[in-house]
């Protein structure tokens, strides 16, 4: 995959449930602590190395941000780092928390 693919939150949720991809959240620490998808890994400059050690390049990665804009840049960056399949989630956490309120965790 030379380019990331945009997917909606329903497709992202399905991929997560079926363990077809991992989910990363790139929002700031305060926003992440105030609510994030239950299975999301908080991806920051400080946690990138750990994420890359724990997830092979053939692991599909879904990137979530606030509304689905910042995630596109991060998705492109992950492709450049060597990940084979990367998705940007349209609507971001804002839409996720509306569609899946039971699957929101709080705290860091």
From Swiss-Prot:
Transferase that catalyzes the transfer of sulfur from thiosulfate to thiophilic acceptors such as cyanide or dithiols. May function in a CysM-independent thiosulfate assimilation pathway by catalyzing the conversion of thiosulfate to sulfite, which can then be used for L-cysteine biosynthesis. The keyword Cell wall biogenesis/degradation does not apply. It holds the Pfam family Rhodanese. GO terms for biological process: glycerol metabolic process. It is found in: Cytoplasm. GO terms for molecular function: thiosulfate-cyanide sulfurtransferase activity. Keywords: Cytoplasm, Transferase. It comes from the Bacteria. PANTHER family: FAD-DEPENDENT OXIDOREDUCTASE, THIOSULFATE SULFURTRANSFERASE GLPE. The active site is at residue 65. This is Thiosulfate sulfurtransferase GlpE. The keyword Cytoplasm applies. Belongs to the GlpE family. Its main location: cytoplasm. Its EC number is 2.8.1.1. Residues 17-105 form the Rhodanese domain. It catalyses: thiosulfate + hydrogen cyanide = thiocyanate + sulfite + 2 H(+); thiosulfate + [thioredoxin]-dithiol = [thioredoxin]-disulfide + hydrogen sulfide + sulfite + 2 H(+). The lineage of its organism: Bacteria, Pseudomonadati, Pseudomonadota, Gammaproteobacteria, Enterobacterales. One of its GO terms (cellular component) is cytoplasm.
